[in-house]
């Protein structure tokens, strides 16, 4: 009798398992309230009964039914054309005996938002004007897919979350930078905006990079950070669970706010993130825009000036990886002892101004910081030339804060620098080359140089200057 009972239960379990397997399933990134990238062919995928033909019907394009066949492994994928921004719509996947229908689907712009604590930082954690911003966060055209903090040793195919409409309750728990970025875009583009938020405080870039890329690269493998007890540090562990399940969801681009946890291995940072971006672009199928925030002034108490070297690496990436851009936020720092600048609205909106200009062709506000172009010795003076989309420099203090001149002996020289258009001119009375000119090239100095639009100058350190 006992054996018969076990046999019946086993057959029921097997039957139930077969039925579950036969059901049409979608990953959680496809759920009610989602945003699909407008004017493109978006990938839609999931699981089902092997060899079954599925039909995908979109309410925005009712005359075009997309068909696909489930493969022998029970997986399927199809490309579904989208049109102009709008909604709400339905999206349905139908099989012979089962179907899945999604509602409140919007067509608009989709951005991946990733990084460490400054990207993760929410209104609940404390932001400028937080209570007021939360109260005003009812924004139905902004949709949030907040990926829970979880790692995995191997690439995963799904994560446990769902799309949510931006409300005071959902906004206060997600990335403030990402939310303000999305809100600015939807206000200016007049289209729905969806944000895929995958961020975890304290994490180095290695965890967001496929493990084999780090381990097989001699430089990256040698320079990877040692184990740390408080947050993930193993290469690939967050890529596997917080990026890979989103692949190949169609995105317009990515914003990235990370770097603080990599200052100790700063010299290889540009190499690391360049390879990470390359891997992500391969996964998502195109060279999407990758925009990021240069780490802000902060009193790390680090050795060997590593935070300055990290910022230098972040700027170096601009010349190494195509379709990238960076914003500087040193002017938004209120307390250099706090590694988390609290004016997340200004940071998110500065990133949005960058995207509005570069991606959507609409200039809505300043975002670009001047960069060092060259420095040379001319008849008893050093001329530092800056480049960028600005007309003239100005200083918010009588003497330029953060500007340092050293001579061939390593002595710091006190000089009164002058500003002339895009140039900084430093008189040199006693010639003792080679000279170096640096600006905010340390941990925490907030410089006084600004453009006429108020944008801060990027930190820099010149090469030795000795020829006239």
Predicted regions and their residues:
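Bacterial Sec-dependent N-terminal signal peptides
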Residues: 1-25
């Amino acid at each position: 009798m006992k054996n018969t009972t076990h046999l019946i239960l086993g057959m029921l379990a097997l039957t139930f398992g077969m039925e579950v397997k036969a059901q049409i399933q979608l990953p959680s990134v496809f759920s009610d309230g989602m945003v699909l990238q407008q004017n493109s062919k978006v990938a839609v995928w999931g699981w089902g009964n092997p060899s079954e033909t599925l039909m995908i019907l979109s309410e925005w394009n009712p005359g075009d039914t997309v068909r696909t066949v489930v493969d022998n492994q029970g997986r399927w994928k199809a490309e579904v054309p989208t049109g102009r921004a709008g909604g709400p719509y339905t999206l349905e996947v139908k099989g012979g005996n089962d179907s899945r229908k999604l509602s409140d689907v919007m067509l608009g712009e989709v951005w991946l938002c990733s990084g460490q604590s400054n990207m993760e930082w929410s209104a609940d954690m404390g932001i400028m004007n937080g209570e007021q911003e939360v109260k005003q966060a009812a924004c139905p055209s902004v949709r949030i897919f907040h990926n829970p903090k979880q790692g995995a040793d191997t690439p995963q195919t799904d994560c446990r979350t769902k799309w949510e409409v931006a409300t005071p309750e959902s906004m206060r728990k997600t990335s403030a930078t990402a939310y303000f970025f999305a809100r600015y875009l939807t206000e200016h583009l007049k289209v729905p905006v969806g944000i895929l938020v995958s961020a975890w405080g304290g994490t180095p870039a290695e965890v967001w990079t496929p493990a084999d890329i780090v381990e097989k690269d001699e430089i990256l493998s040698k320079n990877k950070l040692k184990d740390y007890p408080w947050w993930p540090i193993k290469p690939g562990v967050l890529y596997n669970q917080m990026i890979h399940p989103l692949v190949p969801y169609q995105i317009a681009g990515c914003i990235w706010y990370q770097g603080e946890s990599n200052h100790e291995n700063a010299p290889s940072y540009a190499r690391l993130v360049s390879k990470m971006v390359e891997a992500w672009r391969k996964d998502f199928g195109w060279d999407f825009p990758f925009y990021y925030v240069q780490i802000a002034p902060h009193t790390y108490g680090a050795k060997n000036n590593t935070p300055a070297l990290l910022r230098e690496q972040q700027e170096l990436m601009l010349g190494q990886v195509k379709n990238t851009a960076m914003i500087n936020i040193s002017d938004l720092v209120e307390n250099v002892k706090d590694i988390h600048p609290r004016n997340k609205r200004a940071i998110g909106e500065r990133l949005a101004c960058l995207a509005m200009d570069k991606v959507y062709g609409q200039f809505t506000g300043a975002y670009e910081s001047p960069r060092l172009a060259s420095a040379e010795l001319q008849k008893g003076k050093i001329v530092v030339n800056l480049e960028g989309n600005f007309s003239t420099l100005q200083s918010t203090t009588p003497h330029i804060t953060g500007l340092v001149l050293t001579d061939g002996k390593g002595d710091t020289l006190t000089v009164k620098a002058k500003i002339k258009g895009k140039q900084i001119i430093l008189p040199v009375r006693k010639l003792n080359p080679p000279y170096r000119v640096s600006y905010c090239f340390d941990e925490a100095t907030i410089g006084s140089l600004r453009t006429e639009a108020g944008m801060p100058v990027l930190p820099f350190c010149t090469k030795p200057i000795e020829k006239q």
